[in-house]
Amino acid sequence: MTTPKKTAKTSGNEARELADLSEDIGIRFKYPNSERVYLQGSRDDIRVPLREIRQDDTYTAQGAEANPPIPVYDTSGVYGDPAAHIDLKQGLPHIRTVWLDERGDTEILPKLSSEYGIERAHDPKTAHLRFNQITRPRRAKAGRNVTQLHYARQGIITPEMEFVAIRERLKLDELSQKPEYAKLLKQHAGQSFGANIPTHPDQITPEFVRREIAAGRAIIPANINHPELEPMIIGRNFRVKINGNLGNSAVTSSLTEEVEKMVWSLRWGADTIMDLSTGAHIHETREWIIRNAPVPIGTVPIYQALEKTGGIAEDLTWDLFRDTLIEQAEQGVDYFTIHAGVLLRYVPMTANRLTGIVSRGGSIMAKWCLAHHRENFLYTHFDEICEIMKAYDVSFSLGDGLRPGCIADANDESQFAELHTLGELTDKAWKHDVQVMIEGPGHVPLQRVKENMTEELQHCFEAPFYTLGPLVTDIAPGYDHITSGIGAANIGWYGTAMLCYVTPKEHLGLPDKEDVRTGIITYKLAAHAADLAKGWPGAQLRDNALSKARFEFRWRDQFRLSLDPERAESFHDETLPAEGAKIAHFCSMCGPKFCSMKITQEVRDYADKQKAQRQGMEEKAVEFVKKGAKIYS
C-alpha cells in the first residue's frame, strides 16, 4: 500500500485537488495476504464485511500442515476491497436505502430545511468545493419515530441489527465447530465486572442486539441520511470500539487532506470518525467525508455554530444552534456531541482547578452562561434537541465539558456533578427513544480510573461510555498516545464501550497522517487488550495464531497477523533484510545459536524421539511376553 501523498493546504488549490481525488492519493489499499469477504444475512442485501488473513503452511518432518485463515473485524469499507469501484466524486453505494424505504416511516423532503444549508448550496463562491451528487434529505414522517432504539423497544429487529450481530460474531460460531480451529480458539476466562458478555459466539444474535439497544446499553449510530453506512454497534457487551478524530483548523489542513485522512483512518481500523473542523469550509468538508464514509461520523455542532458568529461565544443563540443541528442532520451526521451538562452553577466549581475547563465545547458554553448569567441553552432546550434527533436518528454523545485536563483535577466535584446531569439528560432522551452514549475523561491517575466507570454505570443507567483515554500521567508530551493507551485499556476492561484515540501530537499540534496511524494502532491495541480481559468470545484467536506463527518461525504470517504489518516487517528487515531471513529459524535478537524458541523446538524433537523409542521398547516387551518370554527360541 502506498502512503497517501501530501496535499496542498491553500484554498486556491482545492478545486484542482478535488478533481484529482479519485486518481492517485492512495485511497485503495491492499492488506498483505488477506481479502475482504462478505457474510450473507437473511436477505440478499445484508452483506456483512470481514477480512480473512490467509496463513502459510507449517512444514515439519512429517510434511506440510495447513494453517486456517483468521477472520478479523474490518472497517476499511470499499477502500479495502480490490474488486470495488472507487470514485470519491460519486460517493459510496447506498446500501441502506432499500431498508429505509421498506420501513415506510420517512419522507424525502423537496429541499433542505436548514437556512444555512440552503445558503451554502446556492453560494457561487463555494461551488467548486461542493460535492457533486446533491441529494434531497430524508426525515421522519409527522408523528413517526425512526430511531433504532424505538424499533428495538417495539420488538422489531431491523436489518441494521442483524448486520451488526453478524459483524460482531465474525462467523466464530461456525469456526468453533471445525477441528482445525480448536486450539486457536482457546482463551483465558475474562473478568467482566458485571457486564452481560456472551459466553459463546452463537449467543451473539440479532435478538441479543435488539435487547441491548432496547435497554439503552448499546447504540447503532445510523442517521437515515447516511445510507452509505456499514452499521456497527457501540455497547459494553460488545467488542470495544475506537474513534478517530480529524478536521481542519484555522491554522492548517485542507478539505482534500481531511478526506484522505478519513480514508487513512479506516485503513488502520477506526470504527467511527469525528469531524472536528473549525476552519474554512466546514459544511463542504463534512459533506465530502460523509458521502465517502462507511463508518459513523460524529461532530460537535457548537464548533460550527461558533464559526457562524465569527468566534464570539456570547453571540450564540438557540435559533442559530437549532439550524446547525438540522443542517448537519440532513447531511447525515450519525452522532452529535452536545455539552448540555455544563450548567451555570457548575462553572464556579472549576475555579480552584489546576487547569480549569479544558473542553473546547465546555468552555464555549461556560463563557456563554457567564456572559448572559443564564442557564445553558442546550440544557433548557434539550427536549427540542431530542425532537430533531429522533426525526433523523442522530445519536447523542453527551459531552463531558467539565472533564479534568490534568490528573490533579480528576474525579472532582464539577466533573461528577456534570456526569450526574448527563444521567438526567439520558433519561430524558430515552423518553423520546433517542439513542445515547456518555462521554468521559480525560486525565485520571490509574488508581482512580475504575471509579469513573462505576459512577457512569450508576448515574447514567448503563448507557455506553465513550472516553478520551484517559491519560494516566501528565509528564509525557509527545507520548500521550501511550499515557492514554494505558488508561484506555483499563477503562475498556471495566466497561467503556468506545475509546477516543489520542495521537503523539496531543497538547502539541494538529496530527498528520503518521500521527493518526500511531494513534489508531495504539487504541486498537488498547481495545483488543480490553476485549481479552473482559472475555469477549474469540478475542484470543488472533493472538494464538500469531503466537503459533512466531514459534514456527513463519515470519510472513507474523507480519500479516499483526495490527501494523508494514511496521512489523520493516523493523524485522532493518537488521535482517535478506529475503531468506523471512524463513530463517532465528531473528537478530538472539541469533541462530541462542534462540529460545529454536532450542524449545529441539527439546520437543528430542522428547518426541525419546517417546518414540520408549514406545518402541514397550511394544517389543509386549511382543516378548506374548511369545512366551523365552530368551532363546
Swiss-Prot record:
Pathway: Cofactor biosynthesis; thiamine diphosphate biosynthesis
Keyword presence, Lyase: yes
Binding site for substrate: 245, 274, 303, 339, 359-361, 400-403, 439, 466
Keywords tagged on the record: 4Fe-4S, Iron, Iron-sulfur, Lyase, Metal-binding, S-adenosyl-L-methionine, Thiamine biosynthesis, Zinc
Cofactor(s) needed: [4Fe-4S] cluster
Residues engaged in binding Zn(2+): 443, 507
Biological process annotations from GO: thiamine biosynthetic process; thiamine diphosphate biosynthetic process
Highest taxon, organism lineage: Bacteria
InterPro entries membership: ThiC, ThiC-associated_dom, ThiC/Bza_core_dom, ThiC/BzaA/B
Note accompanying the cofactor annotation: Binds 1 [4Fe-4S] cluster per subunit. The cluster is coordinated with 3 cysteines and an exchangeable S-adenosyl-L-methionine.
Subunit structure: Homodimer.
Family that this chain belongs to: Belongs to the ThiC family.
HAMAP family in the cross-refs: ThiC
Name this protein carries in UniProt: Phosphomethylpyrimidine synthase
Organism of provenance: Neisseria meningitidis serogroup A / serotype 4A (strain DSM 15465 / Z2491)
Lineage: Bacteria, Pseudomonadati, Pseudomonadota, Betaproteobacteria, Neisseriales
Gene giving rise to this polypeptide: thiC
